[in-house]
Design a protein with these regions (language model features):
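Structured alpha/beta or helical-core interaction and ligand-binding surfaces enriched in interleaved
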Residues: 25-166
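Feature marks short, highly hydrophobic, charge-poor N-terminal signal-anchor/signal peptide-like helices
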Residues: 1-11
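Core hydrophobic alpha-helical membrane-spanning segments
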Residues: 9-19
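Juxtamembrane cytosolic interface motif at the C-terminal end of transmembrane helices
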Residues: 18-26
């Protein structure tokens, strides 16, 4: 009887320890979601609110190489925002100047960051700060006017380094 009690106690403690370990283990900080172009602002708000410094979301065409990426920056407690990053690479070469023209036509300031190596030679970078409307509208226009996709197109939102919902 006493040995049965000890055995049950050992299994009980082991189950509790395993449960605590599984509950406290690091959870994934990335996830995929299929969205319509009308959901871009919601996704960018999620990145801004729950993303870690340098967290990002990539909006991409399923089964295609075309994408638009936004990253989050945190410079200090009061200075955080979103940055659009559009690469100059073999797949995007045909779109690169069109993205620049779109930004210039909208009066949006951008900078070009040289990477100096690899297939991605440079990035167009736009600091949207906390302007979710501007960021979402620009992203949507890149998909519709530059990539020439139908407004009803669904894209994949791939989040990286974004805290899970509570």
């Amino acid at each position: 009887m006493r040995s049965e009690f000890i055995l049950i106690a050992i299994f009980g403690v082991a189950a509790i320890v395993a449960g605590v370990f599984l509950y406290r283990r690091p959870r994934p900080v990335e996830h995929l979601e299929e969205i319509g172009l009308g959901d871009l602002k919601r996704c960018l708000a999620l990145l801004l609110q729950r993303g870690y410094d340098l967290g990002f979301v990539v909006f991409e065409m399923p089964g295609d190489q075309r994408f638009v990426e936004f990253s989050k920056y945190v410079r200090d407690q009061h200075n955080r925002g979103l940055q659009l990053d559009f690469p100059r690479s073999p797949w995007s070469e045909q779109y690169y100047e069109q993205v620049k023209s779109l930004l210039e036509g909208k009066g949006i300031r951008y900078q070009v960051e040289d990477t100096r190596n690899g297939p991605v030679r440079e990035f167009i970078q736009v600091d949207f700060g906390q302007d979710l409307d501007g960021a979402a509208a620009t992203c949507r226009e890149i998909f519709e006017r530059v990539f020439r996709v139908d407004p009803g197109t669904r894209v994949t939102a791939d989040y990286q380094h974004v805290a899970p919902a509570p």
